[in-house]
Amino acid sequence: MKDLLNLLKNQGQVEEFDAIRIGLASPEMIRSWSFGEVKKPETINYRTFKPERDGLFCAKIFGPVKDYECLCGKYKRLKHRGVICEKCGVEVALAKVRRERMAHIELASPVAHIWFLKSLPSRIGLLMDMTLRDIERVLYFESYVVIDPGMTTLEKGQLLNDEQYFEALEEFGDDFDARMGAEAVRELLHAIDLEHEIGRLREEIPQTNSETKIKKLSKRLKLMEAFQGSGNLPEWMVLTVLPVLPPDLRPLVPLDGGRFATSDLNDLYRRVINRNNRLKRLLDLSAPDIIVRNEKRMLQEAVDALLDNGRRGRAITGSNKRPLKSLADMIKGKQGRFRQNLLGKRVDYSGRSVITVGPTLRLHQCGLPKKMALELFKPFIFGKLEMRGLATTIKAAKKMVERELPEVWDVLAEVIREHPVLLNRAPTLHRLGIQAFEPVLIEGKAIQLHPLVCAAYNADFDGDQMAVHVPLTLEAQLEARALMMSTNNILSPANGEPIIVPSQDVVLGLYYMTREAINAKGEGRVFADLQEVDRVFRAGEAALHAKIKVRINETVKDRDGSVTKNTRIVDTTVGRALLFQVVPAGLPYDVVNQPMKKKAISKLINQCYRVVGLKETVIFADQLMYTGFAYSTISGVSIGVNDFVIPDEKARIINSATDEVKEIESQYASGLVTQGEKYNKVIDLWSKANDEVSKAMMANLSKEKVIDREGKEVEQESFNSMYMMADSGARGSAAQIRQLAGMRGLMAKPDGSIIETPITANFREGLSVLQYFISTHGARKGLADTALKTANSGYLTRRLVDVAQDLVVTEIDCGTDHGLLMTPHIEGGDVVEPLGERVLGRVIARDVFKPGTEDVIVPAGTLVDEQWVEFIELNSIDEVIVRSPINCETRYGICAKCYGRDLARGHQVNIGEAVGVIAAQSIGEPGTQLTMRTFHIGGAASRTSAADSVQVKNGGMVRLHNLKQVERADGNLVAVSRSGELAIADEFGRERERYKLPYGAVISVKEGEKVEAGAIVAKWDPHTHPIVTELKGTVTFVGMEENITIKRQTDELTGLTNIEVLDVKDRPAAGKEIRPAIKMVDANGKDLYLPGTDVPAQYFLPANALVGVADGAQIGVGDVIARIPQETSKTRDITGGLPRVADLFEARRPKEASILAEVSGTIAFGKETKGKRRLVITPTDGSDPYEELIPKWRHLNVFEGEQVNRGEVISDGPSDPHDILRLLGVSALAKYIVNEIQDVYRLQGVKINDKHIETILRQMLRKVEISESGDSSFIKGDQMELTHVLVENERLAGEDKFISKFTRVLLGITKASLSTESFISAASFQETTRVLTEAAVTGKRDYLRGLKENVVVGRLIPAGTGLAYHSERKRRRDADKPLRVSASEVEAALTEALNSSGN
């Protein structure tokens, strides 16, 4: 018995390991794993169902079918354990050994492993320096390969077909050795002398000049070094022994009706054994060569199919015409071993049910049906029943529970007390998709969920289901209570704002109770205190909305914790006074003395959390909810068709718009505007009309007339139900009301372009058939989008999580003083995000000085909280350098200072926080949310009217930034640069707003001029792009030949002509090379030169330009000589958004990216080549000129002789992040990517903290490219991990050797995930075969540093409480002690974490 216990003890204990190595298996190793050779293809006997001897299920090899019982039944029972039966040869053991014992097949002829052959790049091919085609011809017996040329003229590795082989035989006899098949390949691999080859390659690489050759050689060198360093031998890539999987992992199960269900692997193994046995027989018979050859080829194909079916040739199919599932298919893909069984396991002690509302629950509770609780907590109930002495055995306890006796319910209630359960709703898009609650037993079968956590779960009650999980161990319960309790997750990890915010009915109730009405009952009364207000209201003497005065006692807590009490009389309403009763002490009365819209409530909860702490906030949130529900019931708000009041002005607005459209149509008919311009103008008109209608409608809805106390008629805010719902933020938006009571507006076609005719009707009036038909486009597109985008967004999240999963906070401070420069984010002239918001929760990297002085006002190392933000804004600081995850110098992780505040807790981030996963979830979660919300506006085209002027919002001084301008005859300036900006500064010199000025903008103010608020300071035509002259003179046309480079369009109706430049593709052959241009000459016909240069003033005209001047016309400075029509606009919808985010994270090079200057210097144009222009930049520092060929159709922003700085835009287009990184550095790249991604999310009103994007970006910048190898072992052009290179350089510097130099490389998230250190993580992500092949050949070690690897091997993850476990393991291992972390240690660690979070 003792032995048995020891045995059981050893079963569960896995020996300690720190890394997992993967390599090639040698034939000896395969034989050492094996318990015997499988010689026959038989599986089980069809009559006795017993496994056949020496077959694929043989009990002698793999172990007994029944526990402790040999096959013939001679030895049964535990006492014979370990005996080998002399009759049937089976060892008496547990049947479980059939899951772990392997066997082998001795192959009659070697077989190449298909992974190393076909998985690109082919490892066998690289090593032998032969092409894949050639090797395949040898392997599949089409050609001979020379193994040993001897003294002949043949070369080693040369391929010979049959004819050549027989000729050679005749010529040289036996002097040479040429063979075919895998044994030939094996011989060649065996003959490779790795050391000699490595030396040769290392000498050869520096001597070659061709890039491609260097690449090829360094690939070979890498592979050889990998083989040499890993202890793998090249010939092991060819199998001589094939391992056989244990039988219980490829089961054969009898079904009823005498049929069998079997794993496909058995079929594949059977084929291999059959062919192998046949080959052995043929060899024994010394059959003709051609037959043996064929059999060998078939054996090779059978093994290929077993390892990876379908990788070469047609996949082998089973009886049902489906391809058989091979070993490779078992591990890859969503249904493979990694993703299905190792990373995504099913969990016991769980259940699921439909959810309903639990409006009476407290925030930390959930309603759990008794039935479910009884099932989930069974073991606990059994234990309690026994302990109480109500049941003598577990069996008796079971019976009691089945009968559901009354005492069982009492015990259940006791068991459940303070035992949290986890509730999860799929899809779990962020960590708030699983939270812990204390269960409350309820009747019925549905789980009750607290309304305030619905936002976090994205749950509604239209049939959603949720799963319940029971944390069993004490540690698990502790973690659930301390870390996952819903009351501990009030703030969203994505942006640090409250996520437990009332919505819908609750908001409506609170809004209704805090509104004021004129001349309500009790108006003007004065009350002594809140209690009196309450009494009078209950007695019905004062209405809820009555304006009153009341004396209040408020306690105000300052940020520094000092408490001041004061008593004052406030003007307020009855409802607000009642609401103040539930507000915790410490908040001023002003927080409720306003109509409580959703934003205000959110702000209130946030303020409450920051001022009075977590506990009070939770109680307060609950009270708010109860109050809100109560008053929304009292309000009796409902919707009727009469609530949709259609404004009287609607008809007038629509008529005038229709007239204007007719006017434009007639202009088009008379040729004054082009089709594109007409389209743009019409759409602008209707957009404006739509806005006007909705303004009129809202104005109409939002006001109502009432009689005040004096009997006069006055206006007050309306109590229209629909208006209240929208205004409070409970449901609906102005855009939706506009469709109900205004007009539906413009619709989009399925391709995204806008239909010119709008829908002028609204839903109250009803749509005509045509209007209904037009609107179906948009609606249908919305639904189709939703389905597609959900999948895309989920995939984006998966890639993000994968790239960032191993990023954990591992130390407090890495000590760097690098950081990112933070400035306010300005868009369209407005400050979208002030500096304060951007630096909140960050650590200052370098001291911040008071503007204009040397006084340090914010020292480096400060964690900026709300108080500091106020301070920074008071001191009008414009820029701050803050620490960022991108610049963090911690290896294998990130430091707390560079990350800053843990957004979900509101203090500095704890060590062990998995910030990578949090970042990935924060970015991925709204992606899904947004894509699920495309169709809420019913596809109505929300296109903004194009901006055509700059109107300043604040008065102040004009500042012009890097603007080139010319002065027109009328004194106005015209911008002739593209990156110019106009800013307005206030009297302190702080910039209040900033606008981009497009090329050709007419500016009516000068630098330093004072302007009033509301002044229009610049104008331009938004629909065309002008070409402006910079000097005065006469126009001459160059290369403008009719119907060759230009076409004159004469409008049939008007007889007016305009000149349009033809696109190169539309020109006849004669015109392909001609570049039409407009040249400026003086009165004598001499060339004029651009101001300050010796470059002739010649303006090249791009395709489709419309020329607006005649040949020989006189023009002045700043006049427009040609216009380029702009593209018509498509609606910007997150549909464009999600792919945009994916493109940015995948670091894809955009099509026709903008061209940046590679060096700083002076621009010149060299000799042109076919279809390309030669751009030459002469550097300012006197080094060699830089040349670049640019396609002629690219529109250049620079003129000859202009000065450019490195990284400046030469030709417009979407930016290429790789160029930004190369030319402008990491900070510029970070700024670009963060801003671009934020723009997409901001468009949808989603807030994500910048640091999440930076965290992902850090992972994308992990790799560097070696530019000079110095004394290191790196090869130039290699991609290495940054940490590796830094460690190596430190070592070299310590030995006074030359360090290697490198440049940073930006990898897309997919590529970064696949090139991670850990092969387990990469293999479980994508391209499993390729990753494992590469890892095996190089003999990779996985040090299990990330989260994923540890989940796969079944350990605690090295994050959170698991980090303590791992560091303790490491400490113990260093001290060499047995390891066990006790519950008390975990508890201590948790308490510490909680204490720090409580502060």
From Swiss-Prot:
One of its GO terms (biological process) is DNA-templated transcription. The keyword Zinc-finger does not apply. Signal peptide: none annotated. Mg(2+) binds at residues 460, 462, 464. It holds the Pfam family RNA_pol_Rpb1_3. GO terms for cellular component: DNA-directed RNA polymerase complex. It catalyses: RNA(n) + a ribonucleoside 5'-triphosphate = RNA(n+1) + diphosphate. Belongs to the RNA polymerase beta' chain family. DNA-dependent RNA polymerase catalyzes the transcription of DNA into RNA using the four ribonucleoside triphosphates as substrates. The RNAP catalytic core consists of 2 alpha, 1 beta, 1 beta' and 1 omega subunit. When a sigma factor is associated with the core the holoenzyme is formed, which can initiate transcription. NCBIfam families: rpoC_TIGR. This is DNA-directed RNA polymerase subunit beta'. It comes from Pseudomonas putida (strain GB-1). The lineage of its organism: Bacteria, Pseudomonadati, Pseudomonadota, Gammaproteobacteria, Pseudomonadales.
